[in-house]
């Protein structure tokens, strides 16, 4: 009786992690089309673009440090 219980426990412990872990096809890195749809970029979001522009621009020729570091100043890409 104890050996049967041990075998059953061993089988359960070996099989459970295989089903509990996500499979390779379920990883976001394997689904680039879905990642691109979920990507929220400033090109798609005008409110974010406005916030970045307001944060960067101090004048026509002057850019803030954050804006220079991120290659965005006064609407330039």
Swiss-Prot record:
Residues 28-38 have a biased composition (Basic and acidic residues). One of its GO terms (cellular component) is extracellular region. Disulfide bonds join 56-67, 57-73, 63-74. Expressed by the venom duct. Keywords: Amidation, Cleavage on pair of basic residues, Disulfide bond, Ion channel impairing toxin, Neurotoxin, Secreted, Signal, Toxin, Voltage-gated sodium channel impairing toxin. It comes from the Eukaryota. Its main location: secreted. GO terms for molecular function: ion channel inhibitor activity; sodium channel regulator activity; toxin activity. Residues 23-51 form a propeptide. The modification Cysteine amide is found at residue 74. Residues 1-22 form the signal peptide. It is found in: Secreted. InterPro entries: Conotoxin. Residues 26-46 are annotated as: Disordered. Mu-conotoxins block voltage-gated sodium channels (Nav). This synthetic toxin potently blocks rNav1.2/SCN2A, and rNav1.4/SCN4A. It also moderately blocks rNav1.1/SCN1A, rNav1.3/SCN3A, rNav1.5/SCN5A, and mNav1.6/SCN8A. The inhibition is reversible. Negative results: does not block rNav1.7/SCN9A, and rNav1.8/SCN10A. Belongs to the conotoxin M superfamily. The cysteine framework is III (CC-C-C-CC). This is Mu-conotoxin BuIIIA.
């Amino acid at each position: 009786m104890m050996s049967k219980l041990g075998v059953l426990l061993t089988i359960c412990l070996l099989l459970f992690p295989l089903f509990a872990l996500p499979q390779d096809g379920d990883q976001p890195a394997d689904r680039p089309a879905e990642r691109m749809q979920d990507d929220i970029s400033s090109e798609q979001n005008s409110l974010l673009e406005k916030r970045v522009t307001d944060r960067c621009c101090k004048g026509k020729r002057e850019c803030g440090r954050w804006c220079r570091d991120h290659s965005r100043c006064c609407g330039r890409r």
